[in-house]
A protein has these predicted regions:
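Residue-level signal for short hydrophobic patches within transmembrane helices
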Residues: 13, 17-36, 40, 62-69, ...
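Short runs within selected transmembrane alpha-helices of multi-pass transporters and secretion channels
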Residues: 74, 78, 143-162, 169-177, ...
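Hydrophobic transmembrane alpha-helices of multi-pass small-molecule transporters
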Residues: 65-68, 180-185, 214-218, 290-293, ...
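Interfacial/gating helices of multi-pass transporter permease domains
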Residues: 44-64, 96, 131-135, 199-200, ...
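Short alpha-helical transmembrane segments in multi-pass integral membrane proteins
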Residues: 1-24, 81-148, 194-250, 306-371, ...
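Small-residue-rich hydrophobic transmembrane alpha-helices
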Residues: 53-116, 150-169, 280-338, 342-344, ...
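Transmembrane helical elements of multi-pass membrane transporters/channels
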Residues: 22-41, 142, 153, 176, ...
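Helix-terminus/linker motif at the lipid-water interface of multi-pass membrane proteins
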Residues: 32, 36-54, 123-130, 186-197, ...
Length: 459
């Protein structure tokens, strides 16, 4: 049996529990490591000053704009390539991969130009504190202009997943995270032979880690990927391949892009209270990102299985895969919520929090952490919608979750109460509303896929 057939048979015949663990666990670990270095980055920056932490917090929505495009294109590849392979269409699979790479290259050039032209203006629009403007614009400029590792690393890792090589994808992401964690303090504080770069040192460590991960993923693909064989002609995009990638990837772009916009607008609301409130929200965003990394890891393992088995007409495997992923994420998010609810002061101490920051932050974390189970389940449901050819459902749910609900409830509670302690309640309220919407859309999707009503109630 050929290596191609073996990789395909694993997606179509291996027991679902074992397959989901094998495909997802390495990615969950690597995403955890990735989230850890995002937190470590902020921890080290907080040692510079609270203004430096605020500058990084204000950069986060802008940083996620590039991440949104990179993730969206990689999600499109991750869903459509296994689907083409399941349909025995290798030519289409290669064209989809080549088109995703081309679109990533164009996106990288756009953000490179934005990095040179707009970063200072972005910060001046948000604050008049010179330290925040200077440090933040320099930080963001590096992240945008040196974004090759972000864009190509995401795609190359998803290509490894499509080929049934999750361990290789995990190693490449772990390599980038370890690079960042090691070089963060060296470049921020000027340890040993390294220059003291302050906040820009954190940016250089981040892009260096992304490039290291992308290079290792490239090497792994050349050695282990036996399903995707790219030719120069595959990099010439065509309308059909662009539709294949974007029909699945666009909802993910919208999800993260609207999250960036929502964070930006919420930061403006919080700045009306204090810069400390904005710094606290930045800490929550990093902690939330850390807690959702297992969800994203599970998604990466789940998507190829769902797409392949839908295309190969194995509905029972589709249902069982989704059910197991959904239950696992629910249990994990509840556990994380309970653990973190017990240690908010300790979490804030990691970020060198002042007493005024702790006074705001402890209350904020207690409230915001309640949102984790609802958010985790919603993310799994919307990802399944994308994989199962219901991207329009995912788009609706993501727009509500990432932008409309969160910003609406934050703005509403702020306008009605002018009380910061009440404004934080917008986070769990928005996640609950989004979960209800996604659940109703999911039931409708099951009916469209000719799944029974019992199956819909089961989930």
């Amino acid at each position: 049996m050929s290596e191609n057939s073996t990789a395909e048979n694993q997606l179509g015949t291996e027991p679902i529990g074992r397959l989901l663990v094998r495909m997802s666990l390495p990615m969950i670990i690597s995403f955890f490591i990735q989230a850890l270095y995002n937190i470590v980055d902020s921890i080290f920056v907080s040692r510079i000053s609270e203004n430096a932490l605020t500058a990084v917090s204000l950069a986060f929505p802008m940083q996620m704009a590039a991440h949104a495009i990179a993730v969206g294109l990689s999600v499109g590849l991750n869903a459509r390539v296994p689907e083409a392979i399941g349909a025995k269409d290798e030519i289409r699979a290669n064209r989809i991969a080549g088109t995703a790479i081309f679109l990533s290259f164009v996106s990288m050039l756009v953000f490179m130009a934005a990095g040179f032209l707009f970063t200072t203006a972005v910060y001046k629009h948000q604050t008049d504190v010179a330290e925040i403007i200077d440090g933040g614009s320099a930080y963001l400029r590096i992240l945008w202009t040196v974004s090759a590792g972000e864009f190509f690393g995401q795609l190359l890792e998803k290509m490894l997943l499509c080929a049934g090589c999750p361990l290789s994808a995990m190693l490449s992401q772990a390599c980038g995270a370890v690079f960042n964690i090691i070089f963060d303090p060296l470049l921020i504080f000027g340890i040993g032979i390294f220059p003291r770069l302050g906040i820009t040192g954190a940016a250089w460590a981040t892009v260096g880690g992304q490039i290291a991960a992308a290079l290792l993923a490239l090497i792994m693909n050349l050695k282990h990927n036996h399903l995707i064989h790219l030719q120069p002609s595959d990099f010439r995009p065509d309308i059909s391949s662009c539709k294949d990638v974007l029909s699945v990837g666009f909802p993910s772009m919208v999800t993260i892009g609207l999250s960036s916009l929502s964070n930006y607008l919420i930061n403006q609301i919080l700045l009306s209270y204090s810069t400390t409130a904005t710094a606290v929200y930045g800490i929550w965003a990093k902690l939330q990102n850390f807690c959702y990394m297992p969800v994203f890891g599970m998604n990466n393992g789940m998507v190829p299985i769902l797409s392949y088995n839908l295309s190969a007409h194995h509905p029972d495997r589709v249902k069982k895969t989704f059910h197991m992923a959904w239950v696992f994420i629910l249990l994990l998010q509840v556990c994380l919520m309970v653990i973190l609810e017990c240690i908010p002061a300790s979490l804030l101490s990691l970020f060198n929090a002042s007493e005024s920051m702790k006074a705001i932050g402890i209350q904020a974390l207690h409230i915001c952490l309640l949102s984790l189970p609802f958010g985790g389940m919603t993310i799994i449901m919307t990802t399944a919608m994308q994989s199962l050819r219901h991207s329009h459902y995912a788009l609706i749910a993501n727009i509500l979750r990432q932008f409309i609900n969160l910003y609406f409830f934050t703005a509403l509670l702020s306008a009605l109460t002018h009380d910061l302690s009440i404004v934080w309640r917008a986070v769990p309220i928005a996640e609950l509303a989004s979960f209800i919407t996604a659940f109703l859309l999911m039931r409708s999707m099951f009916n469209h896929l000719h799944l029974s009503e019992d199956d819909a109630h089961r989930f």
